[in-house]
UniProtKB/Swiss-Prot annotation:
Full protein name: Succinyl-diaminopimelate desuccinylase
Gene source species: Blochmanniella pennsylvanica (strain BPEN)
Cofactor(s) listed: Zn(2+); Co(2+)
Residues bound to Zn(2+) 1: 72, 105, 168
Molecular function terms, GO-annotated: acetylornithine deacetylase activity; cobalt ion binding; succinyl-diaminopimelate desuccinylase activity; zinc ion binding
Gene, per the UniProt record: dapE
Keyword line: Amino-acid biosynthesis, Cobalt, Diaminopimelate biosynthesis, Hydrolase, Lysine biosynthesis, Metal-binding, Zinc
């Protein structure tokens, strides 16, 4: 394994300030890398988002087992650089750590996938199979013009993907200790409670919507969402993310109060039931309200199969332990590929520094991740 090339590529990607949905030359870097490996590379632009679809096979006339790697080049905003020990887009290596925004989520994994693939093709130039990449710059943002649009195009072309590895940071305490094979759904709501504005010294002449909402919040947080326990996912849960009014004077009660919340839901709690439970509470409290809903993702679950078994064995080979299969955490682009009937796993770096100031990846983990990816390719493609 060419580890110096791995570190150099990861640094080059991290040094691009690709805050979502801007890829900021990352896709050109990756396209050039893949073209040197004789990949067929296609750049797909949808509105403000650039996506990359690429594939490589040795024998074009045969139907091949296809292994797809999915990743994203966009990152979340690093915030004020003064809070970072090193510039967030420096890609600096210090004390065996590669520093920078995206080191974990997920430019490190992208570099690991690419170098693993390059080493595999170099070692097995006449392999029978197909390796593909789908890379977007719109995963951390809206996701509207990213992976989902590319998948729609692939379905229209009758592309068949057997296996898919998403490079999201799935690991927790040790690299490879967790493989994700599904995620809960995500439903966001913005609730507006209507009152009437007035002077704080004369509450009898106004209806303070902040006071009105307080009794209902306790009921909201104590909803029994799941009528039976899911064997695939964690329980459905709600989190209130913001409560605010647009009024700034301390001697005036506001006309409205706005509450933002998010529900992560499993297969035992439907979207319709979530809306009904929440509407029932505010109706029961006789509050004048309206809710704007946004569905970000429905739950997805990928039944463990050949890819999962191969990944488990690859991790056991290098780490000497067996990983856990989980469906915890946030949403991922794996849900779009799962619609194609593809076996999907998420396997990547440790997630302890995801979206945090001073994000970094241990170089030992980066090298190990690339080695695990390469062994998965070998065991899936060569042993058919």
């Amino acid at each position: 394994m060419n580890y110096s090339a791995l570190i150099t590529l990861a640094q080059k990607l991290i040094q691009q300030p690709s805050v979502s949905p801007n890829h900021h030359s990352c896709h050109e870097i990756i396209a050039n890398y893949l073209e040197k490996l004789n990949f067929n590379v296609e750049l797909m632009r949808f509105d403000n988002t650039l996506n990359l679809w690429a594939f490589h096979s040795c024998k074009k006339q045969q139907k091949h087992t296809t292994l797809l790697f999915i990743g994203h080049t966009d990152v979340v905003d690093p915030g004020d650089p003064q809070f970072w020990d090193y510039p967030p887009f420096s890609g600096l290596v210090h004390n065996n750590m590669l520093h920078g925004r995206g080191a974990i989520d997920m430019k490190g994994a992208l570099a690991a996938m690419l170098v693993a693939t390059a080493n595999f093709i170099d070692q097995y130039p006449n392999y029978q199979g197909r390796i593909a990449f789908l890379i977007t710059s719109d995963e951390e943002g809206s996701g509207i013009n990213g992976t989902t649009k590319v998948v729609e195009s692939l379905i229209a072309r009758n592309e068949h993907i057997n296996y898919c590895i998403v490079g999201e940071p799935s690991s927790q305490d040790q690299l490879g200790d967790v493989i994700k094979n599904g995620r809960r759904g995500s439903l966001t709501g913005q609730l507006t409670i209507h009152g009437s504005q007035g002077h704080v010294a004369y509450p009898q002449f106004s209806k303070n919507p902040i006071h009105l909402i307080i009794p209902a919040l306790s009921d909201l947080l104590n909803i029994t969402w799941d009528r039976e326990k899911s064997i695939l996912f964690p329980p459905t849960a709600i989190q209130i993310t913001n409560i605010y009014s647009n009024h700034k004077n301390n001697n005036v009660t506001p006309h409205t109060v706005i509450l933002n919340f998010n529900v992560r839901f499993n297969d035992k709690c439907s979207i319709d039931n979530i809306k009904r439970y929440i509407n029932d509470i505010f109706t029961r409290h006789t509050l004048p309200y309206n809710i704007n809903w946004k569905l970000s993702a429905e739950p997805y679950f990928s039944k463990p199969g050949q890819l999962t078994n191969v990944a488990i064995n690859a991790i056991k080979y290098y780490q000497k332990f067996e990983p856990r299969l989980e469906t915890t955490g946030g949403t991922s682009d794996g849900r779009f590929i799962a619609k194609m009937g593809t076996e999907v796993i998420e396997l990547g770096a440790r997630n302890h520094m995801i979206h945090k100031v001073n994000e970094y990846i241990d170089l030992i983990d980066l090298k190990l991740l690339s080695s695990i990816y390469k062994k998965i390719i070998e065991d899936l493609i060569l042993i058919q």
